[in-house]
Amino acid sequence: MAKETFYITTPIYYPSGNLHIGHAYSTVAGDVISRYKRMQGYDVRYLTGTDEHGQKIQEKAQKAGKTELEYLDEMISGIKSLWSKLEISNDDFIRTTEDRHKQVVEKVFERLLKQGDIYLGEYEGWYSVPDETYYTESQLVDPIYENGKIVGGKSPDSGHEVELVKEESYFFNINKYTDRLLEFYDANPDFIQPPSRKNEMINNFIKPGLEDLAVSRTSFDWGVRVPSNPKHVVYVWIDALVNYISALGYLSDDDELFQKYWPADVHLMAKEIVRFHSIIWPILLMALDLPLPKKVFAHGWILMKDGKMSKSKGNVVDPNVLIDRYGLDATRYYLMRELPFGSDGVFTPEAFVERTNYDLANDLGNLVNRTISMINKYFQGELPAYEGPKHELDEDMEALAHETVKHFNESMESFQFSVALSTVWKFISRTNKYIDETTPWVLAKDDSQKDMLGNVMAHLVENIRFAAVLLRPFLTHAPKEIFKQLNINEPELFELESLEQYGALKQPIMVTEKPTPIFPRLDTEAEIAYIKESMQPPKSEESKDEVEEPSKAQIDIKDFDKVEIKAATITDAENVPKSDKLLKIQIDLGLEQRQIVSGIAKFYRPEDIIGKKVAVVTNLKPAKLMGQKSEGMILSAEKDGVLTLVSLPSAIPNGAVIK
């Protein structure tokens, strides 16, 4: 009989720079689910990969003096190396530059075009021919006004004259599927997880009205070309999302994997891209008349004490550093235990070292070491089969073992990894306490208690086996080492099914003669300092003299009072179609929500600014930039042509006036 299938995916990562611990978080979570489902007997297919097209990749390659593929091959080598080091058990790795993917993107685009879901339109903006770039009115140098309107100006990059032009663009008519999408949500209430994300999608995006989506670009050429109109490159919305089916051979000569595994059981992603997976992707699949995935799960961010990870802040955590220094299991355990999946979590060196020392070295490691040492001391390493009386606590321990398995499975099914691990650690802690309560060292002094002592030892070994089996999806080395030191060699005893019966481990039990620590204790102060040092950006070899910009003319306090500046939180951001420099940003001002269009796209990716607390000029007259309404201006600092958002402490409430 064929096994039931389970198809799981991570987002495909954009290889414009080295991956950090946040990327590892998504991929380790997917690996934990995959391993758990395999232990349950599922035929699992686990997909991850890279999103390799777009202007940023083109610019990165040019800056490095390489072709796009040369640059990408180097970056992908590092990504695959990290996944290997993390022992990610993915079954496939999709690159959007592969022919198997590009051919599917071409076919999907042409099909949607033919059936009228994609149409050709125009986008209007200020264009510099030498720069091959569109600019917003606010970006123009020396703007020319007529009757209060800008009618011309110069490029901020080259100084060339700009002209108002219209550019062709293909648009995806997603609004026509709104009612059908809402009906799907109603019929599948668990489709978007956690539930708070569903409310956010409906209230913030669907109810206000979905705008047709620009799905092609002509301002760069690194991407999949539209077959029927090759001057257009397919934009990210279709290119990247299609990977989930192109990797299975959809629309190819061999679609066996697609027929077997689609629809996906779960798409994992960070919360900033849940909108694309819960709105655009379902609509795209509806247009293709394909089944929709069963679930999209948006996990939170790994934050630092001072906000999101940033090289400039010196708080980027490289997973390679943690693995090389502390081992794979300590790294995977921390990610899944400390950070509640579905919510934001804070990484601190202190918590990492504490989890390693207290949970892994003290609780688990010492339990294994103490048990093996006692069996060696009291039974010369071989625990015979005993038929004697049980200790009064033994039935409680057996019941707790089964209860632990039940709660563990419930938590794993809902992807509550930290809760699942907490359940196991409560069991481990109770087992440690069981040693203190049964006092084996006292029983060993009385020959008449030998059978009782044997039963206590047998319960300790069985409890350790239960814990090791449950930890297999999370820890790839420690369970194997535990089984080895306990001399448990039967493969069936490593599986979840073996936990249905307490005492499945048959005696006699022969343990290793000299137990070795599974998790050595860390020097707390030294290792905290080491992690903090590894997070600092490399110091430049030479410090450049800073030249201050000349100040502008002085103003009166009355002039300054005319400007209203308030604190706001960025709740969403996305690129403005056909613009290389603009982001469309949604902000929360406390009593109202606003949209602002800001020229920071060259310095920030949309997902990097969501959640930031910023300063906003709120009494500017509304303007339209590239067809998008803008109701204010987010303050930023400029140095050497680089813009940096002015960030505010999170304690300042939204809407607070800044004076």
UniProtKB/Swiss-Prot annotation:
PANTHER family: METHIONINE--TRNA LIGASE, MITOCHONDRIAL, METHIONYL-TRNA SYNTHETASE
Motif 'KMSKS' region location, chain numbering: 308-312
Location in the cell: Cytoplasm
Gene it is expressed from: metG
Name of the top EC class for this enzyme: ligase
Name of the molecule in the record: Methionine--tRNA ligase
Keywords: Aminoacyl-tRNA synthetase, ATP-binding, Cytoplasm, Ligase, Nucleotide-binding, Protein biosynthesis, RNA-binding, tRNA-binding
Gene Ontology CC annotations of this record: cytoplasm
Chain span(s) of sequence motif 'HIGH' region: 13-23
Self-association state and partner proteins as the record states: Homodimer.
Keyword Lyase assigned: no
Annotated organism of origin: Staphylococcus haemolyticus (strain JCSC1435)
Pfam families: Anticodon_1 (PF08264), tRNA-synt_1g (PF09334), tRNA_bind (PF01588)
Keyword field contains rRNA-binding: no
Family: Belongs to the class-I aminoacyl-tRNA synthetase family. MetG type 2B subfamily.
Gene Ontology BP terms: methionyl-tRNA aminoacylation
Sequence ranges assigned to domain tRNA-binding in this UniProt record: 559-659
Cysteine pairings via disulfide bonds: none
Catalysed reactions, as listed in the record: tRNA(Met) + L-methionine + ATP = L-methionyl-tRNA(Met) + AMP + diphosphate
